[in-house]
Amino acid sequence: MDRLIIDPEFRDKIPPLTEDEFTLLEENILSDGAVFSPLIVWDGTILDGHNRYEIIQKHPELTYAVHKVSFANRYEAISWICKHQLGRRNLTPQQKKYLIGQRYEAEKMAHGGDRKSTTAKSTVQNEQLKPKNAAVTRQRIADDAGTSESYVMRAGWYAQGVDAAEDALPGIKQEILTGAIKPTETAVAAVAKAAPEER
């Protein structure tokens, strides 16, 4: 069995299965005797197939395939994860907004550099995404997602707010994204803008 890496940041971009959904997936795979959908991997790290890999580890007799993909950096990989997950039919509106926002934030980093880090090493990482390029990125994502450029920008703030809320109160991300609690979009975005001690 391949030893693949699970990156928590990559894994956490993917809406988790419920316990019942995971059990059903495991039963179906065991019934088939194989994992038919390949695990998608970048540099030995799983991008898609975390649940299938967990099942494979529990049942090493299962056959499976690995499909390797190539990206220039981890932000391109995150963008791919978000775009791929947006193709799922069973997303809540909150999960969809979060994924669109995460994709936008990742593509800003992939194409515009690390705008927050003072320790970024390459000059490419230190370049800021120009406003015109940010608008082009938002419009491209909006076209892909069937939404508006302004929605993509708001989704970026929403995603940052959800992640900031999770940092302040672990477990709340799942409650927000499943709709168990329904804060306003403005309230979620405000968390991202607040100083860490005020969250």
Q: Where in this protein do the model-derived segments appear?
A:
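A residue-level signal for conserved active-site and pocket-lining positions in enzyme catalytic cores
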Residues: I29, G49, I100, V152, ...
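Short, charged/polar connector segments at secondary-structure boundaries
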Residues: M1-V69, E76-N90
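Alpha-helical interaction elements
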Residues: R89-T186
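Generic structural signal for secondary-structure transition and capping sites
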Residues: A34, I181, P196-E197
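Residues that cap or delimit alpha-helices
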Residues: T18, T92, L169-P170, A194-E198
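Residues within well-ordered alpha-helical secondary structure of globular protein domains
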Residues: N28, Y158, K193-A194
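A short, Lys/Arg-enriched interface patch at domain edges and termini
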Residues: E185-R199
